[in-house]
Amino acid sequence: MLQMKQPLQNLNQSQKTALAGVFVLLFPILYPNLFSPLGRASPSLFSEWNAPRPRHLSLLQGALDRQISIRQQVELWSPLADQGWKPCTESYRGASLPEKSEGFLQVFLDGGLNQQRMGICDAVAVAKIMNVTLVIPRLEVNTVWQDSSSFTDIFDLDHFISVLKDEVRIVRELPIQYAWSTRDYYATGIRATRIKTAPVHASAEWYLENVLPIIQSYGIAAVAPFSHRLAFDNLPESIQRLRCKVNFEALNFVPHIRELGDALVHRLRNPPSSSQTSGTMDPTDRINTIVKAGAGKFAVLHLRFDKDMAAHSGCDFEGGKAEKLALAKYRQVIWQGRVLNSQFTDEELRNKGRCPLTPEEIGLLLSALGFSNNTRLYLASHQVYGGEARISTLRKLFPGIENKKSLASAEELADVQGKASLMAAVDYYVSMKSDIFISASPGNMHNALQAHRAYLNLKTIRPNMILLGQVFVNKSLDWSEFEGAVMNGHKNRQGQLRLRKQKQSIYTYPAPDCMCKVA
């Protein structure tokens, strides 16, 4: 033993430092699980969160023991009845295009896929208002998602131009004399053709008075930022319907996204045979099992529970002190600490319905609404904060959870892998094909899909966030009381059409602007 120690004692300080450095480099390789906070098993020793345990144990047990009647299943999966409204954009015929365009309009769109989608609709409307030619919008790289996908990477450009050819002039790129008008050009100084001061929800008159004169003087104007830069009210009916025509008819995803989406939908509707429908099962039981499972049907759950959402909410998600510190640091870095919710307690936020539903809570909601554990449930999400440990309770309630990676091969996903906007586009496409859609928290994707599905009269469940926040805070409720409260609180939140009110978004409520009452 002394002979083994002697060489170490003879090492000088620099040699010891080098040896320690090698050990630090090798440590993660020798013990990788300690550095894998998003692994399927558990958080790491150096994770920023602790594995959350179920917050609602009694409700969870009640959900696992629940009995769901066939009648309840049939009602749940039945399509919406005709509500007396139909899309109007197809019957709309705008005024013919003037012979001459006033010039070119460029817009630069930030945000995620659905915020950019709304910006594209607004850009077409603004171009129509000013009688200018729209250059295909430039999609900025989002600071959170880090996706550099362009318009043509996501949307079918030929279809877009064809659908709108009688409404607005659209060009793929600027003529050579305006080739200087680029993002880099506007990033390096003050430019006369750049409009940085477009107010949020600007009126049509604002564009005619402030942007059109620049286009008439220089032949072009670039508006950036442009997100949410057109009002929802006091616009001509033709402009409102044009926005919906862009949103619901002109914006088709590129073929490879649609093909992948169709493949996923087919696999969701036609799962492999399982033991539950094989063997010597009694024919009556076999029929009941098929009915209970909603044969050939599936629901999509948009589970927006990424770090960005968790941090911005200011809520506590049972990840311990490490998680609280990590989310506080994230708020400081991203928003310089200016997050309104951070001044309230967790209980106050939950009572006001301001906390996004955790995977556990959305699982309990689905169970109370009558979804059985046989439900084919497609999970539309980018990345769940807390990884598999956070989803484990939801998976316990619904073993049939699927997502892109479980349904498709690596080869099939190659064109979208690592590209947040393309992955979101696939989720959007699958969501539009589902029998039922439900989102765990408000947001742009929730709003966009709620509107699109309302436009087509498809069933969409809108969680009552205030009610749910209050019942989850109330630890005295048993399962039957919780189930009753949830059912009563969601009777009129399963796709019933709601008319847009003043100042509300046309991209959330398409009626009555884009829909007509059927006589």
Swiss-Prot record:
UniProt key word Repeat: no
Xref: InterPro entries: FucosylTrfase_pln (IPR024709), GDP-Fuc_O-FucTrfase (IPR019378), GT106_glycosyltransferase (IPR052272)
Transmembrane intervals: 18-38
Gene Ontology molecular function, alphabetical: glycosyltransferase activity
A Pfam entry, by short name: O-FucT
GO cellular component, one term: membrane
Its membrane topology: Single-pass type II membrane protein
Record localization: Membrane
Tagged with keyword Membrane: yes
GN (gene name): OFUT31
Catalytic activity, EC: 2.4.1.-
Single Gene Ontology BP annotation: fucose metabolic process
Stated family: Belongs to the glycosyltransferase GT106 family.
Residues the record marks as carrying a glycan: N131, N373, N474
The protein's name in its UniProt record: O-fucosyltransferase 31
Keywords: Carbohydrate metabolism, Fucose metabolism, Glycoprotein, Glycosyltransferase, Membrane, Signal-anchor, Transferase, Transmembrane, Transmembrane helix
CDD domains assigned: O-FucT_plant (cd11299)
Organism ancestry: Eukaryota, Viridiplantae, Streptophyta, Embryophyta, Tracheophyta
Binding, substrate: H302, L303, R304
First-listed, main subcellular location of the protein, grouped into a coarse class: membrane
The protein's annotated pathway: Glycan metabolism
Top-level taxon in the UniProt lineage: Eukaryota
